[in-house]
């Protein structure tokens, strides 16, 4: 997430949306907020709305409701997708401002179904980036230290390994 902000030259006044607030997404919220951005969390779970606000989101949007997403058309400079499921990516493209970018951080196992029209006429783009170079990682750690950014973690004792695996399968892991 940090590498994306650096590579894409995201300004502190940018509007950033984070799609999915699990393991990667919760850090994306923290980094974007500390960067100075106005941050919106797209979450499919009402129970995660409060958590998203506590993690740094300025607002939340129900990602299961296409009308809620359509209502924010043209609002975002950057959308960071941390999910590993297929979504209606064209609706998310429409949520971008002209020259906005949909940036994939989660691995979606299928090919993305995208229309070229919103990209062409809005000069929008889709991309992704790796974690970053060792130098970028050092900068990320320094930034994290300065802004007190820590991951949210969960711990299970060894005798609860099966519970931990089920927790992971259900998409509840942090």
Which residues does each PLM region occupy?
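Adenosine-nucleotide cofactor-binding segment
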Residues: 18-21, 33-91
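Rossmann-fold NAD(P)-binding glycine/threonine-rich loop
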Residues: 106-123, 134-142
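Glycine-centered, small-residue-biased loops immediately flanking beta-strands
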Residues: 100-101
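Short internal alpha-helix immediately C-terminal to a glycine-rich phosphate-binding loop
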Residues: 1-35
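Residues in the short beta-alpha loop(s) of Rossmann-like NAD(P)-binding domains
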Residues: 22, 45, 108, 132
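A short acidic, amphipathic alpha-helical/loop segment
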Residues: 90-95, 115-116
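C-terminal hydrophobic helical "lid"/dimerization subdomain
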Residues: 134-174
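A generic alpha-to-beta junction signature in SAM-dependent methyltransferases
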Residues: 9-10, 95-97
């Amino acid at each position: 997430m940090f590498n994306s902000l650096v590579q894409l030259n995201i300004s502190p006044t940018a509007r950033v949306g984070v799609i999915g607030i699990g393991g990667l997404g919760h850090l994306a919220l923290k980094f974007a907020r500390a960067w100075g951005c106005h941050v919106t969390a797209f979450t499919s779970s009402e129970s995660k709305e409060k958590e998203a606000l506590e993690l740094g989101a300025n607002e939340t949007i129900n990602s299961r409701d296409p009308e809620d997403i359509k209502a924010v058309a043209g609002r975002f400079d950057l959308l960071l997708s941390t999910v590993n499921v297929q979504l209606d990516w064209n609706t998310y493209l429409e949520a971008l401002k002209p020259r906005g970018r949909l940036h994939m951080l989660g691995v979606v196992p299928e090919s993305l179904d995208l229309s070229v029209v919103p990209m062409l006429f809005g000069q929008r783009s889709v991309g992704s980036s790796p974690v970053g170079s060792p130098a970028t990682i050092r900068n990320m750690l320094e930034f994290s230290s300065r802004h007190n950014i820590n991951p949210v973690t969960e711990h299970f004792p060894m005798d609860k390994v099966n519970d931990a695996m089920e927790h992971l399968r259900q998409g509840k892991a942090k």
